Regions:
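Catalytic, metal-anchored helix/loop core of enzyme active sites in primary metabolism
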Residues: 178-179, 190, 275
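NAD(P)+-binding Rossmann beta1-loop-alpha1 motif at the extreme N-terminus of oxidoreductases
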Residues: 1-69, 198-199
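Internal alpha-helical scaffold of NAD(P)-dependent oxidoreductase catalytic cores
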Residues: 111-121, 137-174, 186-224, 268
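Small-residue helix-packing motif on alpha-helices
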Residues: 31, 41, 67, 112, ...
């Protein structure tokens, strides 16, 4: 891949994708990144190396214009409330065939299209935090202006940090509920297991180690075989300890509670889509 990739804002997600590209062998001379301060620049240079062009913007548009000019893919990595302003700022500097990728939650393709030149190829991405360790899930939706080869390029870029799945944009709220916020559910489960372990007589440190390692190990098994029901059945002996625990979970309403929580998450995602619009200011 010799495409030029620009990262506007290099927080956790954009920084992880840039690092993933370098680890995959992408030429650092074809990677540009913007930061707001010299302190951030020094930290990013330590992470990405001195061959990546890192531009300090100080909050001004000129730096983002420099990074954007002639780029094949432009990743917008600022917070959702800053996306509209950033998209408008870079619009004059975009090449007509540059693909603009937003990783901001709740910002729709329509909102982005209203800020960018007519016909600009746009991709909306919902990543999750395991992308920072190369084990993420990144759901994408695209405008009709994105060509197949451009989509493949974006998938190649994002694929350096995890699994890329294309969905319809009207499914993004559901995606947010499943994979976007999903890692926190696993963390909460580990937290609950550790708390219960303490009540059963373990010290706090041991309980947390056991719970965390167990959830991580189960995740690894799912990574190698994504058939959760089969994996569950394989470790559940009739009339055994695991069956007793699982029955307690199910009888206590685990499935119903999970659905309620995820519906709440999806509803909040839909609300956020109404908050970040091109006419917000």
């Amino acid at each position: 891949m010799t495409a030029t990739i620009a990262f506007l804002g290099t927080g956790s997600m954009n920084g992880s994708i840039a690092a993933g590209l370098l680890a995959a062998g992408h030429d650092p001379a074809h990677i540009r990144a913007t930061v707001r301060s010299e302190e951030s620049r020094a930290a990013l240079a330590q992470r990405l190396g001195d061959k990546v062009e890192i531009i300090t913007t100080g909050g001004e548009a000129d730096g983002n214009h420099r990074a954007t000019a002639h780029a094949d893919v432009v990743l917008l990595g600022v917070k959702p409330y800053g996306i509209v302003e950033l998209a408008r700022d870079i619009a004059p500097a975009l090449a007509p065939n540059a693909v603009v990728v937003s990783v901001a939650a709740g910002v729709t393709l329509e909102t982005l299209a209203e800020c960018l030149p007519a016909g600009q190829p746009i991709v909306r991405c919902m990543p999750n935090t395991p992308s920072s360790v190369g084990k993420g899930v990144l759901a994408i939706s695209t405008t009709d202006t994105v060509k197949d080869e451009q989509k493949r390029l974006v998938e190649e870029v994002l694929g350096t940090v995890g699994l890329v799945v294309e969905v319809r944009e009207d499914q993004m709220d559901a995606v947010t509920a499943v994979s976007g916020s999903g890692p926190a559910y696993a963390f909460l489960l580990a937290e609950a297991m550790a708390a219960a372990g303490e009540k059963l007589g373990l010290d706090a440190d041991t309980a947390l180690k056991l719970a965390s390692a167990t959830v991580a190990g189960a995740g690894y098994l799912l990574d190698t075989n994504p058939d959760a029901p089969a994996l569950r059945r394989a470790v559940t002996s009739p009339n055994g300890t695991t069956e007793r625990a699982l029955n307690t979970f199910v009888d206590g309403g685990l499935f119903q509670l999970t659905e309620e929580a995820m519906r709440a998450c999806a509803a909040r995602s839909a609300e956020m889509s109404q908050m970040y619009t091109a006419d917000e200011d």
